Amino acid sequence: MSNFTAEDKAAITSLWGKVNVEDAGGETLGRLLVVYPWTQRFFDSFGSLSSPSAIMGNPKVKAHGVKVLTSLGEAIKNLDDLKGTFGQLSELHCDKLHVDPENFRLLGNVLVTVLAILHGKEFTPEVQASWQKMVAGVASALASRYH
């Protein structure tokens, strides 16, 4: 079951087709680590995260950001089954990595900010509403193993 209207799906997929996953992924994860520094504890193996410039210039941050957004691309292909799409990732983040599920919500909100920056006037309030709905759905799907 999906709460996404045809308009939501069109807004999400249309913008997604214009997203540069490398740029947006690195920017999104980097901003998460800068704005919410307690999230850095999950990335000890990434090397120096000692300052905003170290984080934003860190190739491991960028690479993982690409991985995150690539996974999001799979979600966009499966908007009607986000929980199924993220079942294994939810299990990994809950059982092995012990990530606080609130971090998924924070990451989604940072992504929306990055998309607004990168896509300017194209990121209308209607497009934002659809993307907020989608990132909330992804956060809920990723947190599903915790319940």
From Swiss-Prot:
Any one GO biological process: hydrogen peroxide catabolic process
Binding site for heme b: 64, 93
Gene3D superfamilies: Globins (1.10.490.10)
Sorted UniProt keywords: Heme, Iron, Metal-binding, Oxygen transport, Transport
GO MF annotation, one: oxygen carrier activity
Keyword Isomerase (UniProt): no
InterPro entries (UniProt xref): Globin, Globin-like_sf, Globin/Proto, Hemoglobin_b, Hemoglobin_oxygen_transport
Superkingdom of origin organism: Eukaryota
Tissue specificity: Red blood cells.
The Globin domain, residue ranges: 3-147
Pfam (any one): Globin
GO CC, any one term: hemoglobin complex
Function: Gamma chains make up the fetal hemoglobin F, in combination with alpha chains.
Assembly and binders: Heterotetramer of two alpha chains and two gamma chains in fetal hemoglobin (Hb F).
Family membership noted in the UniProt record: Belongs to the globin family.
Protein name, entry field: Hemoglobin subunit gamma
The organism of origin for this protein: Ateles geoffroyi
Gene: HBG
